[in-house]
Amino acid sequence: SGPSMTRRALFGPKVAPLIQAASLTLALLLFLAACGPKGSYENVGPEELYEALAAGALVVDVRTPGEFAQGHVPGAINLPVEEVARWADRIPKDRPVYLYCRSGNRSRKAAEYLARKGYTNLYNVEGGVLAIARAGYPLVR
């Protein structure tokens, strides 16, 4: 049948469907890897935040300067989420970064943005300052 032999002719009727299935699976995995986020983040609670703080993690409060002044995690730096595009490149990629806000929504948005930029060592504090205060952890002014 010449140069245009089919897979079925080359490998027999039982092997051809397996090759086809393997090819489709590989194509799907490559597609998902290419379309997925470059980085990732994990949701954590106040306890994990304060353990990481003691271990030297970078803690970023993404609230407004006014909110930050009313009380923040000791050692946190204030980088408002509205300005994430300006400050994102200054955050080290090789160090754990913990993000929080009032309730966890703005910090989640910042974490998603940084993850798209390739950050993988990211943690979003679920519940934010509200959860931190409820759990009895200290805030400073």
Regions found by a protein language model. Name each.
Residues 7-11, 20, 24-25, 29-57, ...:
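Rhodanese-like catalytic fold shared by cysteine-dependent sulfurtransferases
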